[in-house]
Amino acid sequence: MLTKQKFWINDMEAITCIMFILIVIGTINICSASLITAYTNFENPYFFLIRHLISLLIGFVAFALTSRFNYKKLKNCSLMLTVITILCLSAVLLVGVTVNGSRRWLSLGFMQFQPSEIAKIVTIIISASYLGQCIDKKIPITVNPQKNIIFLLCLIIAGFVEAQPDMGTALIIIGIPTIMYFIAGLSKKWIGIICGIGFILLTLLATFQPYRLDRINSWYDPWSRSQEDGYQIVQSILAIGSGGFSGMGLGHGFSKYSYLPESHTDFAFAVFCQEIGFMGAFIVFLLLIALAFYCIKIALRTKDNFGKMLVCGITLLIVGQATGNMAMVIGIVPVVGVPLPFISYGGTSLILNMISIGLVLSVDRHNHIIKKSTKNETITTPPIKYLSKKKHLYRLK
C-alpha cells in the first residue's frame, strides 16, 4: 500500500529551506547590484559582497545557536537586553558614524554595527514577555504607563531611533508591538488612541522638518520632481518597468550604474526586478508569503503564550519590512529606508533576521519537546476563556 509522502518533513525544515533560498537570491543580487558602487567608492567591485559573506557566516553561527537555545530564558534577560539596546542607541547619537545625514551606525573597526536592528527584535521580546504573562495570569492588557512600563520602553527606544533620524525603523519599532498588543487583546479604544497620537506626531514631524514634507510631496507626484526629491522613486519605477516579465538578465541591468541611489540596499529589489523581471519578483514574493505562512502555523499551535506572541512579533517584523520595502520601491508609500529581509545589503539586518528565524525554530522545537514529554499523560487543562471581552480578547487562537 502506497503511503502519502510529504514535501517537507516538518515546518522547521520548510522555514530553514525558504530562508536559505532567500539568502542565496539576496547574495547573488547584492553581488550584481553593488559592483559599480563598490568599484567607484572603494576600487574593489566585491567590497560589499565580501562584507555580506562575512555577515552571512556570523549569521549562520548565530542562527544555529539560537535555534537550539531555549527561548524561554529570554524572559529572564529582557531587562538586560533593553538596557544594552538603549545604551547602544545613546552611543550612536554621541559617537555614531554619519552617512547621508543620518547617524545610525557604530564602528567596530573591521565592520559597522546598526543598533536599531537589535532594537526591533528586543522590543518584540519584551512585548511578548509582558503579553504572555498577562494572558497566562488573565491580567487586563493595557498601555497605561502606570500599569505597564513595557510599552513606554518601546516608545523610548523608538524615540532614540527617530533622533538618528530613521523614521522608517522607528515606525516598525513601535508599530509591531502595537499590533502584538491588539492580537493579545488590547481594547480598540487604546488602539485608536495610539493611532491618533501617532498621526499627530507624524504630522508635527513632517511640518517642522521640511525635508520630510518634501519627501511626501515627491511621493505624491514624483514625476514633476523627477530631477529633485522624486528622482529616486522615478528611477526605481523605471528600473522595475524596464525589467518586464523575464528581466534584462542577471548583471545586465543599467540602473545600478549610478542611476538609482542605494541600489544595493533599500532599492535592491528594484535592481532585482530589472534583471530578473516580474517572474523573479513573484518568486521572492511567494517565498516570503510561504515563510510567513509556516511561522503563523507555528504560532497557532504553540501552547506557551510567550512563545506564541514572540513568533507573532517576528512574523510581523518580516512581513512588515517586506511589505514596506516592496511598496516603497514601486511608489505606493514614501521612501522610508526599510530593507527587504534577506535581499537588501546590510550586515546587522541579515544577522538579526537569521537570529529571528532561529528563535521561531526554538519556539517550535521546545514546544515539541514538551508535547512529546506529555504525550502519554492525561492532562485536563481548560481552554483559555475570558469573562469580559472588554478586558480580554485573545484574538490569536
Placement of each model-derived feature along the sequence:
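A juxtamembrane structural motif centered on a specific transmembrane helix
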Residues: 1-3, 326-397
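N-terminal membrane topogenic signal
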Residues: 2-19
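Hydrophobic alpha-helical transmembrane segments of multi-pass inner membrane proteins, especially
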Residues: 20-24, 29-32, 39-232, 270-328, ...
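Transmembrane-helix terminus/interface motifs of multi-pass secondary transporters
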Residues: 35-36, 263, 267, 319, ...
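Glycine/serine-rich anion-binding loops at beta->alpha junctions
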Residues: 110-119, 163-165, 244-249, 338-352
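Transmembrane helix boundary and interhelical junction motifs in multipass membrane proteins
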Residues: 166-171, 248-253, 263-265, 282, ...
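TM-adjacent membrane-interface loops and short helices in multi-pass inner/ER membrane proteins
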Residues: 218, 222-265, 269, 276-280
